[in-house]
UniProtKB/Swiss-Prot annotation:
Gene this protein is translated from: nadE
Lineage: Bacteria, Pseudomonadati, Pseudomonadota, Gammaproteobacteria, Pseudomonadales
Catalysed reaction, written as an equation: deamido-NAD(+) + NH4(+) + ATP = AMP + diphosphate + NAD(+) + H(+)
Name of the molecule in the record: NH(3)-dependent NAD(+) synthetase
Superkingdom of this protein's organism: Bacteria
Biological process terms in GO annotation: NAD biosynthetic process
SUPFAM superfamilies: Adenine nucleotide alpha hydrolases-like
Pathway where it operates: Cofactor biosynthesis; NAD(+) biosynthesis; NAD(+) from deamido-NAD(+) (ammonia route): step 1/1
UniProt entry tagged with the keyword Nucleotide-binding: yes
GO CC terms, sorted: cytoplasm
Quaternary context: Homodimer.
Native species: Pseudomonas putida (strain ATCC 700007 / DSM 6899 / JCM 31910 / BCRC 17059 / LMG 24140 / F1)
Keywords recorded for this protein, A-Z: ATP-binding, Ligase, Magnesium, Metal-binding, NAD, Nucleotide-binding
InterPro entries registered for this protein in UniProt: NAD/GMP_synthase, NAD_synthase, NH(3)-dep_NAD(+)_synth, Rossmann-like_a/b/a_fold
Record HAMAP family: NadE_ammonia_dep (MF_00193)
UniProt-annotated binding residues for ATP: G50, I51, S52, G53, G54, V55, D56, S57, T167, K196, T218
Length: 275
């Protein structure tokens, strides 16, 4: 492991690879306990999470629903609730995957909020967007979509006295691959410190089908490139990112991209600048 790999892995609190099935189950139990502790410390009984159709939100939701199920069983209090939220922009091209995720999760409640009217209304009122290039406008509005989704989740959480769950993990965090104050905003991040293959392994341990576990990851925020794979945006694969974070050798081109992107996106992983 090179020094910079160790530095980044420590900063992101990257967890070691699962040695075996028992280690995986122990990590699942630890993260479920973490979610339960967050609710106890906040003195709240509701969790809210947006479901995209990807493996990250699927895995976070499976952990959340298990935590809620355990709390109800332990306390006898039926008020403990997990709310899964669908947040499409009009009609989502992979809606069938989102519905398949919901079938696996079996959430206590499922809500749907179409973010398109809010996103379009805001974009129409921002004069700075009117003269931008199509590519720039598409990128900026893509971030508006992510932030609007989080506004919707916090609106539900506020109405139901709940906490909002985020889906950030180490393989996304190192690349700064989230919208600042969008999907990067949450009350708790139960996947933090995991690399992508560990997120997939946890989903698989819950019995999620391979079609969802191995689905090509996409943020799907840009209308001009719908369904654009994350890896096309990164310039490296998740396998390379995972290997880097676990101190394994990666080719020099991938190494340089990961380090440069980590440094360029440092502001996204920090609190606002203050004097």
């Amino acid at each position: 492991m090179q020094a910079v790999q160790q530095e980044i892995a420590q900063a992101l609190k990257v967890q070691p690879p699962f040695a075996n099935a028992a280690a995986l189950e122990a990590e699942v139990a630890r993260r479920v306990a973490f979610i339960k502790d967050c609710l106890a410390n906040a003195r709240l009984k509701t969790l809210v999470l947006g479901i995209s159709g990807g493996v990250d939100s699927l895995t976070a939701a499976l952990l959340a629903q298990r935590a809620i199920n355990e709390l109800r069983a332990e306390t006898g209090d039926k008020a403990y609730t997990f709310i899964a939220v669908r947040l499409p922009y009009q009609v989502q091209h992979d809606e069938h995957d989102a519905q398949a995720c919901l079938d696996v999760i079996k959430a206590d409640e499922v809500h749907t909020v179409d973010i398109a009217p809010a996103v379009r209304a805001l974009a129409a009122e921002v004069a700075a967007l009117k003269n931008g290039s199509p590519t720039l406008v598409d990128f900026v509005v893509g971030n508006v979509k992510a932030r609007t989704r989080m506004v919707a989740q916090y609106t539900i959480a506020g109405a139901r006295a709940g906490l909002v769950i985020g889906t950030d993990h180490a393989a996304e965090a190192v690349m700064g691959f989230f919208t600042k104050f969008g999907d990067g905003a949450c009350d708790l991040a139960p996947l933090s410190g995991l690399v992508k293959n560990q997120v997939r392994a946890i989903a698989r341990s819950f019995g999620a089908p391979e079609s969802l576990v191995e689905k090509v990851p996409t943020a799907d925020l840009e209308d001009l490139e719908p369904g654009k794979p994350d890896e096309a945006s990164h310039g490296v694969t998740y396998a390379q990112i995972d290997a880097f974070l676990h101190g394994q050798p990666v080719d020099q081109a991938a190494f340089d991209i990961i380090v440069a992107t980590y440094r360029k996106t440092q502001h996204k992983r920090e609190l606002p600048f203050a004097p």
